[in-house]
Every structure is written in structure tokens, then in C-alpha cells.
Amino acid sequence: MGRGRVELKRIENKINRQVTFAKRRNGLLKKAYELSVLCDAEVALIIFSNRGKLYEFCSGQSMTRTLERYQKFSYGGPDTAIQNKENELVQSSRNEYLKLKARVENLQRTQRNLLGEDLGTLGIKELEQLEKQLDSSLRHIRSTRTQHMLDQLTDLQRREQMLCEANKCLRRKLEESNQLHGQVWEHGATLLGYERQSPHAVQQVPPHGGNGFFHSLEAAAEPTLQIGFTPEQMNNSCVTAFMPTWLP
């Protein structure tokens, strides 16, 4: 009766698990040795137990040399990897440069076409597209210019309104100042006696006698200030001055 098929799963019993590991490890190392001898192959085997213990087999001169050989074939080695990365960067930069160069040339060609140059190589569709682009640019330019003009007009109207308000304020202050000066002058004239006197107060004759120059305080109902002669006194003085002294 043959052996049954062993189910591949983790052995729960610790002792059985260690025994199985030792047996299979030795068998694996034996198979690696046989393969290297029978087939003249360079074989390297590395095993770590669950406790971290290392078991290895190498048919070559050393495990390090075999690992370097493996890394060289798998990843190209450290130097080769760096060189490949540099080559990739150079190729990527070159591709980016070519894209930018083609874009610059396209923009320069479009600029010349917009200026009316190098139009001979363009077809009808390209010329129509160029015409539409120019019309769109003109509409945008005119719209922007109109907006700037409207903004300037609005600013000028705002400044005009501000100047009108300032002018009204100055006019109002000037009128108030003139009115205040008029009141001051009238008040000063009243205090100094320069206000206009009535004709009866000027030509009133004193009831008592006098020499024509001095009058009694009771002569007038209100005290007034009189400077110089009255018209009658001026006439009497002139007549007296021209009369001879021998006349009575």
C-alpha cells in the first residue's frame, strides 16, 4: 500500500515541525549538491529557519561572488543600473527638448502667418482658419479698447462730480464769509457812529445860545457825534471871514 498525498499546510506541532524542517533541509542541500556535480552547474542555496538560523550551500568559489553574478544578470549590476538611469534621463531630456523645439517653431510660424508672412504654403482651410483667428483677435482688441474708454469716461465723470461738489462747498463758504464780514463792518460802523443820521438831528438848532461851535447836551434828544461844521455854520463862517473888521 503506497503513501498517501501529504497536505501542504503549516504543521501545528512544534516538534514535528522542527523534525520535518531538518529532514527536508538536508534533502534540499543534498539535491543542490547533486545538481552541481552531475550537471556541472553553479548552485547557491540559502535557507533561514523560523528562528533566524542560516543554512547555505554554494558550489562556486564563494556565496558573495555567486550573488554578485546573480545581481549582474538580474539587475545589470550597480554601475550598469546607474548608467541606465543616466541614459534614461538623457533620453527623456532630449525628447522634451525636441517637443519644445517643435512647439517654438510652430508658434514662430503662426506669428509670421498672423503678420501676413509665409502665406504661400497655406491651403484654403488654413487661410480661412487664420482669417477667423484674426477676426476674433480684432473683436477682442476692440472690446478691450472700448472697455478702457468707458472706464476712463466713468473716472472723468466721477472727478467732475467731485470738483462740482468742491466748487459748491467753496462758494457756500465764500458767501458765509462775505456775510460775516458785512455784519462785522455794520457793527463796527454802529460803534464808531458812522451810521447814517436823520436830517432833523443834523440841522437841529440849539434852543439856548452858543458860539456856534459848542452845543448843550440837552439840545438833542439822543447823543450824536458831529465832526466839522453844519452847512449853516459853514456859510456864516465864510461871511464873517470876508466882512471888514470895522463893520458892526
Swiss-Prot record:
Probable transcription factor. May be involved in the control of flowering time. Residues 1-61 form the MADS-box domain. This is MADS-box transcription factor 8. InterPro entries: MADS-box/MEF2_TF, MEF2-like_N, TF_Kbox, TF_MADSbox, TF_MADSbox_sf. It comes from Oryza sativa subsp. japonica. One of its GO terms (cellular component) is nucleus. GO terms for molecular function: DNA-binding transcription factor activity, RNA polymerase II-specific; protein dimerization activity; RNA polymerase II cis-regulatory region sequence-specific DNA binding. Residues 90-180 form the K-box domain. PROSITE patterns: K_BOX, MADS_BOX_1, MADS_BOX_2. Expressed in lodicules, stamens and carpels. CDD domains: MADS_MEF2_like. Transmembrane segments: none annotated. Its main location: nucleus. It comes from the Eukaryota. The keyword Nucleus applies. Keywords: Developmental protein, Differentiation, DNA-binding, Flowering, Nucleus, Transcription, Transcription regulation. Gene3D superfamilies: Transcription factor, MADS-box. The keyword Transport does not apply. One of its GO terms (biological process) is cell differentiation. May interact with the K-box of MADS6 and MADS16. May interact with MADS13 and MADS18. Binds to FCA. It is found in: Nucleus. Pfam families: K-box (PF01486), SRF-TF (PF00319).
